[in-house]
Amino acid sequence: MSLLRSLRFFPVACTGRSARAVLLQPSQPWLTFHAGPSLSSAASSKELLMKLRRKTGYSFVNCKKALETCGGDLKQAEDWLHKQAQKEGWSKAAKLHGRKTKEGLIGLLQEGNTAVLVEVNCETDFVSRNLKFQQLVQQVALGTMAHCQNLTDRLSTYSKGFLNSSELSELAAGPDREGSLKDQLALAIGKLGENMILKRAAWVKVPSGFYVGSYVHGVTQSPSLQNLVLGKYGALVICETPEQIANLEEVGRRLGQHVVGMAPLSVGSLDDEPGGETETRMLPQPYLLDPSITLGQYVQPQGVTVVDFVRFECGEDEQVAEAE
């Protein structure tokens, strides 16, 4: 702007030519200014940078470096960023290994006759509330669901299974991600900078005549996580239902709520004598929502038979978890 201003007020000698003629004939080649292509190129680069930043969530510095490395190719730059983040994640994971991971989330996912519970741990509650961590839990749940659905059906009765940390790590990630769950774990560690563990998963699959009730306590939900329900406690309750029951979903939810609150160790029988507050069998326990009756007394008129359950508590001791 100062250059243009100085050109406007430059004194012109009276040589017989007009000032207009002098100004339109720059005496120095470097005074010629072309605005079109360079500005257009800069705008295009900025647009690519913004697009890559929005798509990947990585810093502007890293996105700019990726575009420069890949010659402005958006897809190659995205792949390059993921590979670099994964390398950094594995490096951070090695450094952070051994740090306590008592926080985290339980994830519940149900699709038709199949339900899964997963637990992913981190170091702080702050990170557990981060969307990137919650997306990792989602990938673990989706990977477990795909694993369960690929198993051979047992048509006559329900099936239930568990996956430990090593088994979970080897599962393929969800349908919109590449690699295994341990690759997704490395990416999350690289982004969030905390030690994390894919602790465990449980899955249940039922045929016709059975139903899976579920409940998660301390619910955290995000529209971007679709049908995934997150919390600090979770339960699946397998019921046999020979007839169609109108309020089956509500009954299943209440049974799951009881399992979370009363922490039974076994189902027990309707004929069992109640053992009071220390009772660990589910059916003889005082019903959580009405302690004046046992859970068995609540269940019997509902027309369902409780046959099994799974309970997860985030951060609980591994020996306790194995016993349950």
From Swiss-Prot:
Single GO MF annotation: translation elongation factor activity
Gene3D superfamilies according to UniProt: DNA helicase RuvA subunit, C-terminal domain, Elongation factor Ts, dimerisation domain
GO cellular component: mitochondrion; nucleoplasm
Residue positions, PTM Phosphoserine: S269
BP term (GO), one: regulation of mitochondrial translation
SUPFAM superfamilies cross-referenced by the UniProt entry: Elongation factor Ts (EF-Ts), dimerisation domain (SSF54713), UBA-like (SSF46934)
Transit peptide: 1-44
Modification sites for N6-succinyllysine: K75, K132, K191
Principal place of residence: mitochondrion
Location(s) in or outside the cell: Mitochondrion
Annotated keywords: Elongation factor, Mitochondrion, Phosphoprotein, Protein biosynthesis, Transit peptide
Function: Associates with the EF-Tu.GDP complex and induces the exchange of GDP to GTP. It remains bound to the aminoacyl-tRNA.EF-Tu.GTP complex up to the GTP hydrolysis stage on the ribosome.
HAMAP family: EF_Ts
PANTHER family: ELONGATION FACTOR TS, ELONGATION FACTOR TS, MITOCHONDRIAL
Family note: Belongs to the EF-Ts family.
Protein name: Elongation factor Ts, mitochondrial
Name of the gene: Tsfm
